[in-house]
């Protein structure tokens, strides 16, 4: 950020840069030149035996030719590919960003949510989930009555989402038009139809629903999700003041639907763990730990029950992608890409997002054969200290397509 007082103060106090030099830093190359000479002089003072005749920088013409040679070779080996891939993105600089482009050297890490669209008289109520297999256990929808949502046009459909979600969708190659603001409280008590059933389910209020997470609307699976179970208990007990007396009476018959069988867990594992941990309301921080414990066990050991249509008897770990494909085929699903370690800020100060880059060139770090060769080469290397060897292996495993250039 221009005239960043914190950065300027760091130059003065931490790096002892003279005031006159700082004024020259309006040109980025001047910053690089200054610290280049500072680091070099420090190495000379420490007596490093370095042949400085071989000195170069990454913007030297000769080095740039070397990089061009590398890219030509990678393209010949089909390791540079063209396509559409998600990247960390600075909306201000209009550039892809990776670890060294962010404040604090944070690698933008993101995950793919499945959006499942519930229908409210032709208007889509989209929920984002990492667990599409739990669709068969949905009893209701959660919305935060204190949040101002937006009615938006997404391509040819009308959706209700949080403003934060509407903005994220705009970076994912979707045509977004904001129609109007709407209050979450307006939807409490209304009914929607689920994509897998002709039954109607009710929209209920919940304070744990965050507008900056997913679509700002959540599907409720109280048998297997501790947050959902406790929020349902709060609603049925009359603790939630956003529920009027008529709605309170109507929701008393909502019961958790068990749809996953897991060795070591009961039929309603969310209820069991909430009671075991002494959780008494939906804002209890212990719900995070309860959620992680159940989800981990169900993912690796869970089997889908008989009420999950053609997926009954399959392991969660195997059926998850199949269910995602099924929901997509029947036209009731979409994709939302979300940063998992937000907020991530670009060095310019702007908050980064996930953007879907189309028809761009990428280094195909997801290529399995390339990863395999990299692991073989790495095994032959001496690493000091050896304790960090595993960290390199992890990086090789998680690396995926990366944009070749900033613009």
Language-model segments: residues:
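Residue patterns forming the tRNA-binding/recognition surfaces of aminoacyl-tRNA synthetases
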Residues: 1-136, 191, 199, 213-407
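Protease-associated
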Residues: 132-217, 226, 230
């Amino acid at each position: 950020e221009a005239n960043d007082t914190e950065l300027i103060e760091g130059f003065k106090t931490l790096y002892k840069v003279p005031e006159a030099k700082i004024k020259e830093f309006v040109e980025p190359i001047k910053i690089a030149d200054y610290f280049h000479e500072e680091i070099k002089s420090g190495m000379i003072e420490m007596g490093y035996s370095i042949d400085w005749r071989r000195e170069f920088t990454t913007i030297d013409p000769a080095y740039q030719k070397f990089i061009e040679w590398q890219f030509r070779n990678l393209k010949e080996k089909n390791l540079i590919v063209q396509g559409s891939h998600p990247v960390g993105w600075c909306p201000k600089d209009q550039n892809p960003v990776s670890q060294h482009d962010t404040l604090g050297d944070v690698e933008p890490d993101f995950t793919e949510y499945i959006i499942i669209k519930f229908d409210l008289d032709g208007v889509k109520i989209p929920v984002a989930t990492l667990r599409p297999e739990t669709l068969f256990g949905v009893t209701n929808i959660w919305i935060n009555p204190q949040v101002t949502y937006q009615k938006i046009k997404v391509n040819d459909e009308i959706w209700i989402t949080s403003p934060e979600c509407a903005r994220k969708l705009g970076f994912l190659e979707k045509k977004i038009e904001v129609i109007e603001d709407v209050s979450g409280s307006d939807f409490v008590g209304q009914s929607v139809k689920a994509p897998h059933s002709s039954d109607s389910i009710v929209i209920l209020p919940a304070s744990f629903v965050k507008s900056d997470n997913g679509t700002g609307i959540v599907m409720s699976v109280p048998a297997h999700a501790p947050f959902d179970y406790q929020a349902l208990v709060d609603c049925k007990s009359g603790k939630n003041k956003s529920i009027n007396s008529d709605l309170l009476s109507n929701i008393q018959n909502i019961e958790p639907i068990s749809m996953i069988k897991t060795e070591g867990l009961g039929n309603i594992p969310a209820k069991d763990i909430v009671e075991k941990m002494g959780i008494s309301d939906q804002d209890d921080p212990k719900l995070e730990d309860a959620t992680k414990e159940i989800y981990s066990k169900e993912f690796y050991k869970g089997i889908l029950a008989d009420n999950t249509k053609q997926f009954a008897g399959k392991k969660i770990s195997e059926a998850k992608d199949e269910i995602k494909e099924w929901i997509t085929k029947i036209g009731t699903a979409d994709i939302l890409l979300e940063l998992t370690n937000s907020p991530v800020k670009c060095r310019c100060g702007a908050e980064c997002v996930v953007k879907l880059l189309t028809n761009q060139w990428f280094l195909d770090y997801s290529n399995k054969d390339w990863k395999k060769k990299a692991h073989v080469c790495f095994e032959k290397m001496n690493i000091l200290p050896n304790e960090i060897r595993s960290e390199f292996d992890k990086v090789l495993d998680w690396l995926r397509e990366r944009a070749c250039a900033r613009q």
